[in-house]
Every structure is written in structure tokens, then in C-alpha cells.
Amino acid sequence: MGYETLLHVIREKPLSISEAWVKEYLRDLFEFHFENTPYWRSVSRRLSPDLDEIFQGNLVEVFERIFNAGLAVDEDYLRSHWLDFVPDGYPGRIRFYQSSGTTRERAIGHWDADYLGVLHLYLRAALDEIYGLYKVYDSEHRMRAIAHGPYGWYQDEISELVWSYGGVLYFIGMETDGLKRVLREKGIDAVLKLLDPLVRYTKRVMETDRINTVRSAPPLMSLFEPYRETIETAIISGVGINREFFEYLSDTFVNTKLIPLYGYYLFGDLVGIYRRGEFWYYPNHPTTLVFPMVFQDGEYRIVKRGKRGRVAFVIARPEVLMVKFEDETALRVPPSGPFKWDGFGNPLRDVR
């Protein structure tokens, strides 16, 4: 199944894709990669997974069978052999991106340029449905945005989003290698010193233009406090996002819509909802599935709603298939707002 069909379906109903269609899509993608992608072709020959058996039952059962079939990718192998995950002769427009490197050495993964369109449809629909941004920004009241972040997918994604609202964007690239370690060991002042060019440029922009939208990480939100009266939307993700910080922001940026996102280099940003003191994030079906899992009685199982488990991804696109665990735990949370599927909540890093 190619991007033409995928984009057609997502344009019609980006946040309400049926489970039956997701299963059909996943089955097609697994078959394609088992035949055409070096890594998965090798796995298929070695393990002989029975796709007819794996794709029986509901989506939860399918997800569990994928992991119990031994299909999870080793993180160290992925970091050293990323080219093995590109389909032979793939005709699309591929770009390789890097992870942020805030926690460990950067990983490398690839996107087809058309995936940016899929991701944008999901982001735009979710932000409009949950936060009503389409009511805030239009041709009469333009979005004027500033964003901090690493170059690559992050820059491409936020650019498309701002432009879709008829806005203009200042993108300030930042070096993120080891940022979490610096924050943990030396504190916020050390982070700001490390990012001094970003700090200076941000102040210059804020003093000159009338910025009404910001996209940044928690340690950098203090840069915008002097201008909080004019900031209508703040999109926040990355190191340091937690309940205490979010409540502090709510008290400081009183008239600002605060939007939490969960970012990952292989699939981009997922939209979050802050409710009852928890952050709930929802993947962009059908290309990204996320469930917390536990290993019990010799098998991987998705946890019950409200319980915590290790975060597991299935990323399925024409250009890449990835089945993996993260060194992170999260709660399984029920559908909420416009989302018709389960999400994951309050992720916590669990460095192994």
C-alpha cells in the first residue's frame, strides 16, 4: 500500500481510521517489507513468521503477536545498520534524519518525503479538534511563530504546520547532544550558557517582532516569560516536561494555550492532552502504534488501561518497518477527545 492510498484515507478521516483498515494496512506493509527490505527479508527466512496467524483477532492481539513472534529490533543493531531497513529499489524521496541525542549517541532513521504530509494531516486535525487553533489564526490574525529545536524532521514538521495556518516562522536550530545530562548534573543555567547563541537570537526576535506562538523545550520557556502577554500558543516537548512544570507554566502564561507533544525521530510528534495531572499522548494510526507492555508467563502482553508498562512501537510505512521497545515506561490510557484509539500516558525514561 503506497502513500497515494494512505494520504487519500487520512485526508478523509485522520483521527477516526477504523481498526479493520489499520489491520489491513499493517498486513500489507509487513508483507511488503518481508519481501523487499534486507533486514526483514532475513528475519522472515530465519523465523518464518506466520502472518495469517499474527493478523487474527483485534488490534491488541495483533500487536502482542507481533512482539511474541520475536520481531522486535535490537536497538544497537538499528543504530549500526540503519541502511538494512531501507527497501531495495525504493522509488520514493528518502531523507535520513537523526535523533536529538539528548540522552545517548544519535540514531539515524529515514522518512519518505510523503510521510511529512501524513504527519501534517494528523497534527493539524488533532490541534484543531483539541485546541481549536483554526479559530485563533487566519488571514486576518496570522500565526507568528518561533521554534527551538534540532535541524531535520523537527524543522520540516513545524514549518509545514505554521505555514498551514498562514503563518511565518523563525526557526532557531540548537545543538541537543547530551542536553539532558547537562540539565541533570549542572542545572538550567548551564543549559542556557551552552545555548547562548540561541538565547541571544531569541531575545532579538522577541524584542523586534510580535511573536504569538512558540515551540520549545521546558528549560527554554523562561526566555518567553517577559513576553507572556502576547503569546497565545505554546507547544512544548522534550526534556523536563512534567506535572509541576506544566502547572507552573499555566500560572505564568495565564492566557496561553499550552500544548504538550511527544517527539521521536522515527515518527515525528504525537499530540498530547493534559488531564487530571497526567499527559496523555495519541499515536498517528495507522503508521504508528504505541502500547505499554509487560513480559509475564513467558509472553509479552499489553497492560490494562491505567497500568504501566514498557513502551513498545510498531512503525509501519512504505519506506520503513520498525518493531521495537523503548527504554521508557508509560501508562496505557483510553481514547480521549477526537481519538478513537488508546494512547500512552506519563512516559518515564528508564535508562538500561
Description of each model-found segment:
Residues S99-S100, P260:
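Active-site neighborhood of phospho(di)ester-bond hydrolases with catalytic His/Asp-centered motifs
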Residues M1-E24, D28-L29, G167-R352:
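Active-site glycine/GP-rich loop and adjacent strand/helix microenvironment
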Residues Y39-V43, E157, S222-F224, E244-F245:
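Phosphate- and divalent-cation-binding pockets in alpha/beta enzyme and binding domains
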Residues I130-D177:
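Conserved AMP-binding loop of ANL adenylate-forming enzymes
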Residues L116, Y151-Y154, N242, E319:
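Alpha-helix N-cap/loop-to-helix initiation residues
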Residues L119-A145, L179-I188, P197-E207:
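Conserved ATP-dependent adenylate/AMP-binding module captured primarily in the ANL superfamily
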Residues M1-Q98, R104-H141, P150-Y151:
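Nucleotide 5′-phosphate-binding alpha/beta core
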